[in-house]
UniProtKB/Swiss-Prot annotation:
Primary site of residence: cytoplasm
InterPro entries on file: pacC/RIM101 (IPR050806), Znf_C2H2_sf (IPR036236), Znf_C2H2_type (IPR013087)
Protein name: pH-response transcription factor pacC/RIM101
SMART domains reported in the protein's UniProt record: ZnF_C2H2 (SM00355)
Domain of life (superkingdom): Eukaryota
Subunit annotation: Binds to DNA.
Signal sequence residues: none
Compartments in which it is found: Cytoplasm; Nucleus
Region (Disordered): 139-161, 354-373, 384-432, 452-509, 602-643
Function description: Transcription factor that mediates regulation of both acid- and alkaline-expressed genes in response to ambient pH. At alkaline ambient pH, activates transcription of alkaline-expressed genes (including PACC itself) and represses transcription of acid-expressed genes. Specifically recognizes and binds the consensus sequence 5'-GCCARG-3'.
Motif, YPX[LI] motif 2: chain positions: 625-628
Compositional bias ranges of the Polar residues kind: 402-423
Start and end residues, zinc fingers (C2H2-type): 58-83, 94-118, 124-146
């Protein structure tokens, strides 16, 4: 009895899981699909028991079709080929007749995508939880529930094997909280310092252990200055080579301030190899820092990539070329420092001004200027400023001295050295005075002789103040005020015809009785005419901007020349070019001026040739063996042996 009762109790329990499983599998279908109707959901529910049956026969519920398929794939292909058809075979049907569904589309792709709602075919699986979906758009909506859009990337619809890149999470493990947790469970243990990843929190950069993942990422650290694009560096390199070639061929006059400024203008907008160390073209790249290395944590275990070199400059072949180029650059520096236009634009030629350039020291040599941190002094010849004059680097420096070397005393560029030889004494003066010497304004010819007309500077100043253009300093209180205003004298005899009020003492005088003559006429114009005041203010602003632009351009030229000289000196110290190479090329060439600079290396080439001629003489004098004479050297025509 127990044996017969046991199967009787087990048989009724078999349909129970099937009846309960039907609504469980039918619930995702209407929630996952948006365009399916209620009839399509009912058809999917009715199809569930037949799918779970013992024979797994899936009947086609198309109107008038009784065919059954063993798998969902075959059923889907049957509906698409038999009932939907194709346009090429003239049997295209764009209306769904599955059960009571009458959905109509406009394209075949739309109707075939709609049929997936009815067919229990779920080829699209979720990589996080393993859930399958019928359509790719349903999977895309489901993936958004796992993480934020900024942290996930759903698999592509056409990816057939997504597990190759991101292995599926094994059953029984909790769902991932972000996109990369399940495939790198073994890697996350390396980041012991990082908290477990959560929503809306930054995560360390992951790295997949399988060979299908991406490699390490390296960030090259820049040092000092941005490298820029290689094309820009190549342009600057070529421009610098062309500039050195122009120096060798004397294409422009280094003594002309305009020519030097115009030639340097083409180099200021380019990226030149100017750094404190070697040129960036001759440096190797810094060691990259690896992010997320496989050795655990953030490591830098990557080999250093090799550096690259630019070809040598064609216009700088020998050491003599570098020396001569440095001499030309020094000459260009002196031209910029000694130019009258620059002196006038910098405000040195202002009346009574004593200017000392902050970045220069007065020297008696032709060496390049040395920079210092001292401030620029603009000292005026007045009594309160007399103490500041003593702090000048050169006590014997005359007034209106340009900010340059001591060549101003001998180059006839100083306006003081023209009309008098003892106005600005040289350095042999024993006891210099506390106050700077001022040039004597004798006549108009001597005044204008020191300043060329091109500079546009003011003539040498006399003992007048430096603020004569400011009216507020000319008129002080208690001076130039009239004792009796003219307006009051003209109106005092007029009869008062105004209506009297109750209190005559409280009557306020009219505006015509208020005399404005207490204000100086020179000052009243500025306060009464706002348009004139604004025009003056605008003109002053424009003048300041123009002067600032001139000063900025001058500073850029000075810095460019200093960087060029620093580059040349660095190449000379490196010793990459030997002087013997230049001597050999100059002596071996048929024309001695071919490899040398025109007008510069002529003396060195001649000296080298003379030295080469003298060497055979010295060798002949030191020979201890007898020399055989030729036949033509004998007077009798017979050759004789030496005695």
């Amino acid at each position: 009895m127990t044996e017969n009762h046991t199967p009787s109790t087990t048989q009724p329990t078999l349909p129970a899981p099937v009846a309960e499983a039907a609504p469980i599998q039918a619930n995702p279908a209407p929630s996952a699909s948006v365009t399916a109707t209620a009839a399509a959901a009912t058809a999917a529910v009715n199809n569930a028991p037949s799918m779970n049956g013992a024979g797994e026969q899936l009947p086609c519920q198309w109107v008038g079709c009784t065919e059954k398929s063993p798998t969902a794939e075959s059923l889907y292909e049957h509906v698409c080929e038999r009932h939907v058809g194709r346009k090429s075979t003239n049997n295209l049907n764009l209306t769904c007749q599955w059960g009571t569904c009458n959905t109509t589309t406009v394209k075949r792709d739309h109707i075939t995508s709609h049929i997936r709602v009815h067919v229990p075919l779920k080829p699209h699986k979720c990589d996080f939880c393993g859930k399958a979906f019928k359509r790719p758009q349903d999977l895309k909506k489901h993936v958004k529930t796992h993480a934020d859009d900024s942290e996930i990337r759903s698999p592509e619809p056409g990816m057939k094997h997504p597990d190759m890149m991101f292995p599926q999470n094994p059953r029984g493990s909790p769902a991932a909280t972000h996109y990369f947790e399940s495939p790198i469970n073994g890697i996350n243990g390396q980041y012991s310092h990082a908290p477990p990843p959560q929503y809306y929190q930054p995560h360390p950069p992951p790295q997949a252990p399988n060979p299908h993942s991406y490699g390490n990422l390296y960030y090259a650290l820049s040092q000092g200055q941005e490298g820029g694009h290689p094309y820009d560096r190549k342009r600057g390199y070529d421009a610098l080579n062309e500039f050195f070639g122009d120096l060798k061929r004397r294409q422009f006059d280094p003594n002309s301030y305009a020519a030097v400024g115009q030639r340097l203008l083409g180099l200021q907008a380019l990226q030149l190899p100017f750094l404190s160390g070697p040129a960036p073209e001759y440096q190797q790249m810094p060691a990259p820092v690896a992010v997320g290395g496989g050795g655990g944590g953030y490591g830098g275990g990557a080999p250093q990539p090799p550096g690259y070199h630019l070809p040598p400059m064609s216009n700088v072949r020998t050491k003599n070329d570098l020396i001569n180029i440095d001499q030309f650059l020094e000459q260009m520096q002196n031209t910029i420092y000694e130019s009258d236009e620059n002196v006038a634009a910098a405000g040195v030629a202002q009346p009574g001004a004593h200017y000392v350039h902050g970045g220069m020291n007065h020297r008696t040599t032709h060496s390049p200027p040395t920079h210092s941190r001292q401030a620029t002094l603009l000292q005026l010849p007045s009594a309160p400023m007399a103490a500041a004059t003593a702090h000048s680097p050169s006590v014997g420096t005359p007034a209106l001295t340009p900010p340059s070397s001591a060549q101003s005393y001998t180059s006839n560029r100083s306006p003081i050295s023209l009309h008098s030889s003892r106005v600005s004494p040289p350095h042999e003066e024993a006891a210099p005075g506390m106050y700077p010497r001022l040039p004597a304004a004798i006549c108009a010819d001597s005044m204008t002789a020191g300043y060329p007309t091109a500079s546009g500077a003011a003539p040498p100043s006399t003992l007048s103040g430096a603020y004569d253009h400011d009216d507020r300093r000319r008129y002080t209180g208690g001076t130039l005020q009239r004792a009796r205003p003219a307006e009051r004298a003209a109106t005092e005899d007029r009869m008062d015809i105004s209506q009297d009020s109750k209190h005559d003492g409280e009557r306020t005088p009219k505006a015509m009785h208020i005399s404005a003559s207490l204000i100086d006429p020179a000052l009243s114009g500025t306060s009464s005419d706002p348009e004139q005041e604004s025009a003056k203010r605008t003109a002053a602003t424009a003048t300041e901007v123009a002067e600032r632009d001139v000063n900025v351009a001058w500073v850029e030229k000075v810095r460019l020349l200093e960087n060029l000289r620093r580059l040349v000196s660095g190449l000379l110290e490196a010793g990459s070019l030997t002087p013997e190479y230049g001597v050999q090329t100059s002596s071996a060439s048929p024309t001695p001026g071919l490899d040398a600079m025109e007008g510069v290396e002529t003396a060195s080439v001649r000296a080298a040739s003379e030295q080469a001629r003298e060497e055979p003489k010295s060798e002949s004098e030191g020979v201890f063996y007898p020399t055989l004479r030729g036949v033509d050297e004998d007077e009798d025509g017979d050759s004789k042996m030496p005695e």
